[in-house]
From Swiss-Prot:
One of its GO terms (cellular component) is ribonucleoprotein complex. This is Large ribosomal subunit protein bL33. One of its GO terms (molecular function) is structural constituent of ribosome. The keyword Ribonucleoprotein applies. The keyword Cell inner membrane does not apply. Belongs to the bacterial ribosomal protein bL33 family. Pfam families: Ribosomal_L33. It comes from the Bacteria. The gene is rpmG. InterPro entries: Ribosomal_bL33 (IPR001705), Ribosomal_bL33_CS (IPR018264), Ribosomal_bL33_sf (IPR038584), Ribosomal_zn-bd (IPR011332).
Length: 49
């Protein structure tokens, strides 16, 4: 079952990205390197509830 999640920047805490994930294959929190428009660089983004 796929669920929609929000990704939050770890440095500025802005929630910029929406994505989906399969909970069966990825049970832990998702962490991706994405571009942060506020900081204008690539930073680590973590899944929020």
């Amino acid at each position: 079952m796929r669920v929609n999640i929000t990704l939050e920047c770890t440095s500025c805490h802005e929630r910029t990205y929406l994505t989906s994930k399969n909970r069966r294959h990825n049970p832990d929190r998702l962490e991706l390197n994405k571009y942060c428009p506020r900081e204008q660089k690539v930073t680590l983004h973590r899944e929020t509830k």
